[in-house]
Curated annotation (Swiss-Prot):
PANTHER family linked: BIFUNCTIONAL NMN ADENYLYLTRANSFERASE_NUDIX HYDROLASE (PTHR21342:SF0), PHOSPHOPANTETHEINE ADENYLYLTRANSFERASE (PTHR21342)
EC number assigned by the record: 2.7.7.1, 2.7.7.18
GO process terms (BP): NAD biosynthetic process
Source species, domain of life: Bacteria
Family: Belongs to the archaeal NMN adenylyltransferase family.
UniProt enzyme class: transferase
Other comments on record: Identified as an attractive target for the development of novel antibiotics against pathogenic strains of A.baumannii.
Lineage: Bacteria, Pseudomonadati, Pseudomonadota, Gammaproteobacteria, Moraxellales
Name of encoding gene: nadM
Protein name: Nicotinamide/nicotinic acid mononucleotide adenylyltransferase
Pathway: Cofactor biosynthesis; NAD(+) biosynthesis; NAD(+) from nicotinamide D-ribonucleotide: step 1/1; Cofactor biosynthesis; NAD(+) biosynthesis; deamido-NAD(+) from nicotinate D-ribonucleotide: step 1/1
Disrupted gene: phenotype observed: Essential, cannot be deleted. Deletion of the gene could be accomplished only with complementation by another NaMNAT or NMNAT encoding gene.
Length: 188
């Protein structure tokens, strides 16, 4: 018997690393279904957000069995620089998936000041996780990636395969050039 009908996990997953994997594994143990809210889901690429929402979905699902994949749902959250509008967007997208009278929770880790959004959903039961994988940050992982390295100790196998394939793309080369120039603008 699960504690929740749905657990929501919000993140950018740029890229999907072991702490993300561990969080979803815990969510799958505690909830019948897991809703992954992919942040920064607008169809733009830049050095902070190199992967589109559809690519992140594939990267994430590549790390789970078919049985677990069937229990994972995605919603795409567009960046809105207004907390109230952003919260409304998240709730609206989640509510489109859940069944009425469902017990919904929010799973996450307060890693730093950027995690304040976890407190914006008081109607959802908070499942606060202690530090996972030493509070991994994707920023140095992306930087290494743009330098041509994949920190294999940070990523599950499905992510490693995705990153290796993506490295062969023209888009990766364009992002790598933007990184070297410290150009944070979107790819055109």
């Amino acid at each position: 018997m699960y504690k929740f009908d749905y657990l929501v996990f919000i993140g950018r997953f740029q890229p999907f690393h072991f702490a993300h994997l561990q969080t979803i594994q815990i969510a799958l143990q505690q909830s019948r279904e897991v809703i992954i809210a992919l942040g920064s889901a607008q169809p733009e690429r830049n050095i902070k957000n190199p992967f589109l929402a559809e690519e992140r979905q594939k990267m994430i699902l590549a790390n789970f069995s078919a049985e677990d994949q069937a229990r994972i749902h995605f919603v795409n959250i567009i960046d809105v620089y207004n907390d109230q509008k952003w919260v409304e967007q998240v709730k609206q997208l989640v509510n489109a998936i859940i069944e009425s009278r469902s017990h919904v929770g929010l799973i996450g880790h307060f890693k730093d000041e950027s995690s304040y959004y976890l407190k914006l959903f008081p109607e959802w039961t908070m499942v606060e996780l202690e530090s996972l994988k030493e509070s991994m940050s994707a920023t140095p992982m992306r930087e290494a990636y743009y330098e041509g390295k994949i920190i294999e100790s940070a990523f599950p196998e499905g992510t490693i395969q995705f990153l290796k394939t993506f490295q062969d793309s023209e888009i990766y080369k364009q992002l790598q050039q933007k990184y070297r120039a410290q150009d944070s603008s979107n790819l055109i």
